[in-house]
Amino acid sequence: MHKIYFDRRSIIICTPEEAALTDPNAVEFHFTDKSDIRPLVEMFETSTTLERIYIPSDAVEECYRIVCCQFKEVNAAGGLACNRRGDFLMIRRDGLWDLPKGHQEAGEDISVTALREVEEETGVEDLQLGDLICVTDHCYRRNNIWHLKHTWWYHMSYLKPVDLIPQTEEDITKAAWVAKSSLPPYLKNTYPSIREVFLAAKIV
């Protein structure tokens, strides 16, 4: 299954046997290699009540690649950093809680992108890189072009005390270590893709 987010809503590419049949809000779109994704994007833009569109397919990976190719694809990476107390590093940007992340630079390994972006956005250095958690997909429009951002998320650990320094030029107003027991209100005020990272990491 692949989930492509449009802010808080999503297009879900899955097998016919998956969740579409049990979701009471399911809207199905039957996709072929000649299908155009733009009608789905336009549906999201014009209908604020539409939450999820399912694309059932017996060839999920092939269908996913066909969909991806209809956007301008960009790569990004970030991290779910944990300190020795078991707190998680989060940032506040545009009024919502988020995880530090950013775009991949030319020729840069994606894991290096993840470490660099977390350090730049929070001031935390000497992070230890762990395993890949998941990859999330998010669509956005820029200069009248639809982009599809693939974000690689990694486990990270930090063992030193540090004063957090939010990167204000990236509209980050706060960086904070959040205890696991305190996560629920933070995850309520974040993006669905960020909740997906915590779920994939088996934190919540």
Describe each model-derived feature in a short phrase.
Residues Q104-P192:
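Unchanged
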Residues M1, A76, K149-W153:
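Short hydrophobic/aromatic beta-strand or adjacent loop that forms the aromatic wall/cage
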Residues M1-T46:
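N-terminal leader/capping segments at the start of a protein or of a new domain
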Residues I4, T15-F29, L96, Q167-V204:
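Nudix hydrolase/Nudix homology domain
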Residues G78, D87, K174:
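Conserved beta-strand and immediately adjacent loop positions that scaffold enzyme active sites
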Residues K34-G78:
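Acidic, metal-coordinating catalytic segment for phosphate/diphosphate chemistry
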Residues A20-F31, C82-E119, V124:
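Conserved Nudix-box catalytic region and its N-terminal flanking loop in Nudix hydrolases
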Residues F6, N83, R92, R141-R142:
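Acidic surface patches and DE-rich sequence motifs
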